[in-house]
């Protein structure tokens, strides 16, 4: 057992070696490396697969032994400081290792086909391996400094992968936005780390938690300062896990390749923030004020993400806001003390969301052959519809992922989400109401995405490249009405417009894709892309039973609580009780969920007649109110809750205005004064030089005249 633990460094080391070898060969031998790109891809998949096998072995040892293992060695030490590096293995670490490696391997297999036509194929696998290695190093870290190092590596990799197609202006802007937004959180994280080192004198988790616990119990620490430092620590997860108000980078991250979207939203970047809050849970639980802030940030994020996702037209951005909402659920659970439910939802959501994103990638990959390679076309659900007939495996797996994310039993997310909703009600009726309403919204927008994408008729061939035609919110093309709306902030009733890319021609006519013929109808993806989808359906169906409330245990009614007990044994968790109580509480949430599905079916379903008969079935005043209501919802969703608009006006334009004002002040006031003084001196010298004639008598006259003037001034000055 100990032998296995001593070699756990292999888990992050293997994908790290893969990224280094690919990067070095790509730098010094680019032609030969690109010619052997399939071999390098297999090499990356093989090394990460070995890491996955080790991860499963470690998880099995943790299930059997249920102990915490640390391996440390001194890196920097003197009389005053002894900084150690190493790794920490506990149930939380083992679960995260399996989660990261399994999703990572499936994403790599998927990427082999998805990125096959891309010139950056080899570079993509180098970034992918480094991204996975960074996240694995993060979850194995035993101290704050080591976590911060890998935390920054994760951020760097996300920057590289979001901006992978850096020649596309939108991708370049998106990676910069993600980088700058996360810098805010990382700065707070660094200050929080330094603050707790000042309080406890240690970076090691075990020592830090014990010392801080003793300081709080003995009232030997300033709680105001401790709360402030804890909030600074929490600022890091707020940014990394896209929590309000630093969530704005997440939808823009969809500019990266779809496999990376699956990895970011399932097992790496956004999961890092949740993992950190879980790792620091023994610290945060001693500070009730911070726990309250965490819970409310999570609740606001969950509800906000769900409302913004309601009318998204971009397939990937709709799923991105879904991720934001589900991360809010996890943060809410951790904030109310239900750590098991939060981590449980992290696991179930990861596999379900990976399935959904890879399914969306399969759709995009197929639709690209019809509409071209512009994201505003191939990701726009207004061009889709009826894809289940052409892509049955993708459609079925996407539907299973939708069932899970909506919380329909017996799929995975049902068990975790319902537990969070129930625990929220036990903690606060307000938080419980928010989580319950969010569940209904989730069911609505997820089935809206499914119906617009896979049901009905294929709409792209009806459009005839008339991108100015709107499509109603119900998902039907309207070829009789032109877009006459010119207001930047108000969209016309409930219309979804085809947005064209200003670089559309360059995107669609890339010479690299010139040999690919456009098809009239989409077709199912190849086996390399379908295999990960089929594999991910298994955890989507069955992993929820890991935390199902079966026989009562000592500290919880499920296996997951028992595995996590050594990590959180000091926590007083809110629990929803036994199987019967859980089932009774699930009735309310399921009723809300099925209501959301029913509304989505009426508005977007394949047999929907409500929109066509709207004017016949309801009174004019009600129709007008409904139009205003739907218009508000769509405007709110389209403009992302106006938060991006606010940030753009206050921070972006405000900063530019300040910079322009400072530039004007520097150029015309500071430089003007200095340059003006120099010019004045120059003209003064030029004027005086003509008084010099070379005659001594003239100089004596000037000297005597000057003395007389000075005496005159001195005499009259003394009198007055």
Swiss-Prot record:
Record field: transmembrane: 9-29, 39-59, 87-107, 125-145, 147-167, 189-209, 221-239, 258-278, 286-306, 327-347, 354-374, 395-415, 434-454, 530-550, 590-610, 700-720
Keyword Thylakoid: yes
Biological process, per Gene Ontology: ATP synthesis coupled electron transport; electron transport coupled proton transport
InterPro entries from the UniProt entry: NADH_UbQ_OxRdtase_chlpt_su5_C, NADHpl_OxRdtase_5_subgr, ND/Mrp_TM, NU5C-like, Proton_antipo_N
Pfam entry (one): Proton_antipo_N
GO molecular function, one term: quinone binding
Membrane topology: Multi-pass membrane protein
Function description: NDH shuttles electrons from NAD(P)H:plastoquinone, via FMN and iron-sulfur (Fe-S) centers, to quinones in the photosynthetic chain and possibly in a chloroplast respiratory chain. The immediate electron acceptor for the enzyme in this species is believed to be plastoquinone. Couples the redox reaction to proton translocation, and thus conserves the redox energy in a proton gradient.
Database matches in PANTHER family: NADH-UBIQUINONE OXIDOREDUCTASE CHAIN 5 (PTHR42829:SF2)
Subunit description: NDH is composed of at least 16 different subunits, 5 of which are encoded in the nucleus.
Name assigned to this protein: NAD(P)H-quinone oxidoreductase subunit 5, chloroplastic
Organism of provenance: Physcomitrium patens
Taxon lineage: Eukaryota, Viridiplantae, Streptophyta, Embryophyta, Bryophyta
């Amino acid at each position: 057992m100990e032998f296995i633990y001593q070699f756990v460094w292999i888990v992050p080391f293997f994908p790290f070696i893969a990224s280094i070898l690919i990067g070095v060969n790509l730098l010094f031998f680019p032609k030969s490396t690109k010619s052997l790109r399939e071999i390098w891809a297999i090499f990356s998949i093989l090394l990460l697969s070995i890491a996955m096998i080790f991860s499963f072995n470690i998880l099995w040892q943790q299930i059997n032994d249920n102990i915490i293992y640390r391996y440390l060695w001194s890196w920097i030490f003197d009389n005053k400081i002894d900084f150690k590096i190493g790794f920490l293995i506990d149930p939380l670490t083992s679960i995260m290792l399996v989660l990261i490696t399994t999703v990572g391997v499936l994403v790599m297999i998927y990427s082999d086909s998805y990125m096959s036509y891309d010139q950056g194929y080899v570079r993509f696998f180098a970034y992918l391996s480094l991204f996975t290695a960074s996240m694995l190093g993060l979850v194995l870290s035993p101290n704050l400094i080591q976590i911060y190092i890998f935390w920054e590596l994760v951020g760097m990799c996300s920057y590289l992968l979001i901006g992978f197609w850096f020649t596309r202006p939108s991708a370049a802007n998106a990676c910069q936005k993600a980088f700058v937004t996360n810098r805010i959180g990382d700065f707070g994280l660094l200050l929080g780390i330094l603050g707790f080192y000042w309080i406890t004198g240690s970076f090691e988790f075990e020592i830090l938690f014990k010392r801080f616990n003793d300081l709080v119990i003995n009232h030997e620490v300033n709680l105001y300062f401790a709360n402030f430092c804890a909030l600074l620590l929490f600022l890091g997860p707020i940014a990394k896990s896209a929590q309000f108000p630093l969530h704005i980078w997440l939808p823009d991250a969809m500019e990266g390749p779809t496999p990376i979207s699956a990895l970011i939203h399932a097992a790496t970047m956004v999961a890092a923030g949740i993992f950190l809050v879980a790792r620091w849970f023994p610290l945060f639980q001693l500070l009730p004020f911070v726990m309250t802030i965490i819970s409310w940030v999570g609740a606001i994020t969950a509800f906000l993400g769900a409302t913004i996702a309601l009318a998204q037209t971009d397939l990937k951005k709709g799923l991105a806001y879904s991720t934001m909402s589900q991360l809010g659920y996890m943060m809410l659970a951790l904030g109310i003390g239900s750590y098991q439910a939060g981590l449980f939802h992290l696991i179930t959501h990861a596999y379900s969301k990976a399935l959904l994103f890879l399914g969306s990638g399969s759709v995009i990959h197929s639709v690209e052959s019809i509409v071209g390679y512009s994201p505003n076309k191939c990701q726009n659900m207004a061009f889709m519809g009826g894809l289940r007939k052409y892509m049955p495996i993708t459609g079925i797996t996407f539907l299973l992922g939708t069932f899970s994310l909506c919380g329909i039993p017996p799929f995975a997310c049902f068990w975790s989400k319902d537990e969070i909703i129930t625990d929220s009600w036990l903690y606060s009726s307000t938080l419980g109401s928010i989580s319950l309403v969010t569940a209904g919204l989730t069911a609505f927008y997820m089935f809206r995405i499914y119906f617009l994408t896979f049901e009905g008729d294929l709409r792209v061939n009806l459009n005839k490249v008339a991108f100015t035609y709107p499509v109603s919110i119900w998902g039907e093309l309207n070829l009789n009405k032109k877009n006459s709306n010119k207001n930047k902030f108000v969209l016309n009733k409930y219309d979804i417009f085809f947005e064209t890319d200003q670089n559309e021609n360059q995107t669609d006519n890339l010479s690299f894709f010139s040999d690919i013929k456009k098809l009239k109808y989409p077709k199912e993806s190849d086996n390399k892309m379908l295999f990960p989808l089929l594999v991910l359906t298994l955890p989507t169906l069955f992993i929820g039973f890991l935390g199902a409330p079966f026989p009562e245990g000592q500290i919880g009614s499920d296996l997951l609580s028992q595995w996590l007990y050594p990590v959180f044994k000091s926590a007083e968790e809110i629990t929803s009780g036994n199987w019967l109580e859980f089932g009774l509480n699930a009735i309310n949430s399921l009723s809300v969920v099925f209501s959301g599905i029913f509304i989505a079916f009426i508005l977007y379903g394949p047999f929907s007649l409500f929109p066509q008969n709207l004017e016949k079935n309801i009174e004019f005043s009600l129709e007008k109110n409904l139009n205003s209501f739907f218009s508000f919802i769509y405007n709110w969703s389209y403009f992302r809750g106006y938060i991006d608009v606010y940030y753009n006006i206050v921070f972006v334009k405000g900063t530019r205005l300040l910079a322009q004002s400072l530039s004007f002040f520097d150029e015309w006031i500071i430089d003007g004064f200095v340059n003006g003084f120099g010019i004045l001196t120059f003209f003064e010298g030029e004027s005086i030089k003509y008084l010099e004639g070379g005659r001594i008598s003239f100089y004596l006259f000037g000297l005597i005249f000057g003395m007389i003037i000075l005496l005159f001034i001195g005499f009259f000055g003394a009198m007055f």
